[in-house]
From Swiss-Prot:
The lineage of its organism: Bacteria, Pseudomonadati, Pseudomonadota, Gammaproteobacteria, Legionellales. Belongs to the bacterial ribosomal protein bL27 family. SUPFAM superfamilies: Ribosomal L27 protein-like. This is Large ribosomal subunit protein bL27. Pfam families: Ribosomal_L27. Keywords: Ribonucleoprotein, Ribosomal protein. The keyword GTP-binding does not apply. GO terms for molecular function: structural constituent of ribosome. Residues 1-22 are annotated as: Disordered. One of its GO terms (cellular component) is cytosolic large ribosomal subunit. One of its GO terms (biological process) is translation. It comes from Coxiella burnetii (strain RSA 493 / Nine Mile phase I). The gene is rpmA.
């Protein structure tokens, strides 16, 4: 004879691993070519000057410089660009 009531089952208990999305380098920060600026799903931020976009919509720097976030166009879309660093004169 059972001394414990049979336990029910649950349909919960699952969770997905974190995807580490978001802005990785903020406006004004100095970056190197190849640095990831934004990891995202879809194109919340769009690539501006001197930026590349990976097939998963990751934005990365194509040159060394400073990160700049802007809003452009009639729909005020977010663009991320890289401003080249001024070369110091010897």
């Amino acid at each position: 004879m059972a001394h414990k009531k049979a336990g029910g089952s649950t349909r919960n208990g699952r969770d997905s691993n974190p995807k580490m999305l978001g802005v990785k380098r903020f406006g004004g920060e100095r970056v190197l070519a190849g640095n990831i600026i934004v990891r995202q799903r879809g194109t919340h931020y769009r690539p501006g000057e001197n930026m590349g976009m990976g097939r998963d919509h990751t934005l990365y720097a194509l040159i060394e410089g400073k990160v700049k976030f802007t809003r452009k166009g009639p729909k005020k879309r977010n663009f991320v660009s890289i401003e080249p660093l001024e070369e110091s004169q010897p």
